UniProtKB/Swiss-Prot annotation:
Its EC number is 2.1.1.192. Residues 106-344 form the Radical SAM core domain. The lineage of its organism: Bacteria, Bacillati, Bacillota, Bacilli, Lactobacillales. The active site is at E100, C349. This is Probable dual-specificity RNA methyltransferase RlmN.
Length: 368
């Protein structure tokens, strides 16, 4: 059985080290600063998957690296590729737990959606991610490794495609794993490594107001998205348990602080649930709620991917989405209906992992 622990006993991934930490580790072990820069270059520019491929590093130091670290800690279990080019990956962690990562082809490039936790405790009643409660946080290396394996998948195709955008919107609440997510952001944004621009990275939160305030002060120029999904406290609390701890008044005070501090736009994610949150009245409430920050906010209307375990919910019909959208536009709200990806595979966040675990349990029963 996988171990439920945040302090695993396996060797850490070298991806867990920021560039400054790698330099400090190399110096501590008798090497010069430039040696760490060479290793960093091998990892993020040449993208090797083994220390033994680092041909300008001494055998003794490679042995030391192998003794203390692995390169990529993930094992690829399943890859599903959609007709629209979306690719969904199921990765196995060193302790046997499973996570999902999704590659989406956009008109502006390749965008990867990463997972930050094994399971989720936020408890949104419509979401596949929360079907399994949080087991543990991913460390920085395990989050970074998702990007590296997706990039490897495309490197092996030899077409020169490069991951250009990252969305931290996979399984888990990123701000509930704050330190590791922040290290991940700084690693992938490092100019000497993957050099993915901060404005090409989006972090999504379900609304941990105190962490939004903290994030505003980090000086990290990435984009912030907030999973809103309802325009009033009663409705939001009924579908998102987090609202009972951070009601809309607290959440929007934090969002206003973030905007004032960073002068950056916030995107609101709003999943369209038929007969639940998709009426014209709901749209007017949403327009009123966001009025004060209209110039620096944006609403993303999201078609719902049905989840069998949450069969009380269904996708809003096209005409209801259009009516909702029209109300927002008439009120001057910047909004868009999100383009769908991967509708012919296990598209909903957490679905591939959940379905695979079901199959694994069924196989185990048959084998008993």
């Amino acid at each position: 059985m996988p171990k439920k622990t945040d302090t695993p006993d396996y060797k850490p991934s070298i991806y867990s080290l920021t560039r400054d930490e790698l330099i400090a580790w190399a110096i501590e072990h008798g090497e010069k600063k430039f040696r760490a820069s060479q290793i960093w270059d091998w990892l993020y520019k040449k993208r090797v998957q083994s220390f033994d491929e680092m041909t300008n590093i001494s055998k003794d130091f490679i042995a030391l690296l192998n003794e203390n670290f692995v390169v990529n800690p993930l094992k690829q279990r399943i890859v599903q590729e959609s007709a629209d080019g979306t690719v969904k990956y199921l990765f196995e962690l060193p302790d046997g737990m499973l996570i999902e990562t999704v590659l989406m082809r956009q008109h502006y490039g390749l965008s990867v959606c990463v997972t930050t936790q094994v399971g989720c405790n936020i408890g949104c009643t419509f979401c596949a991610s929360g079907l399994i409660k949080k087991q543990r946080d991913l460390n920085n290396g395990e989050i970074t490794a998702q990007i590296m394996l997706v990039q490897k998948y495309f490197d092996e195709r030899g077409q020169g495609e490069r991951v250009s955008h990252i969305v931290v919107m996979g399984i888990g609440e990123p701000f509930d794993n704050y330190t590791n997510v922040l290290k991940f952001l700084r690693t992938v944004n490092d100019d000497n490594g993957l050099a993915i621009g901060a404005r090409h990275i989006t972090v999504s939160t379900s609304g941990l107001a105190h962490k939004i305030r903290e994030f505003a002060n980090e000086g990290v120029q990435v984009n912030l998205a907030v999973s809103l999904h309802a325009p009033n406290n009663e409705l939001r609390s009924s579908i998102m348990r987090i609202n009972r701890s951070f009601p809309l008044e607290k959440l929007f005070a934090a969002i206003e602080y973030y905007i004032e501090t960073t002068n950056r736009r916030v995107t609101f994610e709003y999943i369209m649930l038929n007969g639940v949150n998709d009426t014209p009245e709901n749209a007017q409430e949403l327009a009123d709620l966001t009025k004060k920050i209209r110039k620096l906010s944006y609403v993303n209307l999201i078609p719902y991917n049905p989840v069998s375990e949450h069969d009380q919910y269904s996708r809003s019909p096209k005409e209801r989405v259009e009516a909702f959208y029209d109300v927002l536009k008439k009120n001057g709200v910047n909004c868009v209906v999100r383009q769908e990806h991967g509708t012919d595979i296990d598209a909903a966040c957490g679905q591939l992992r959940s379905n695979t675990m079901k199959r694994d349990r069924q196989k185990a029963k048959v084998g008993q």
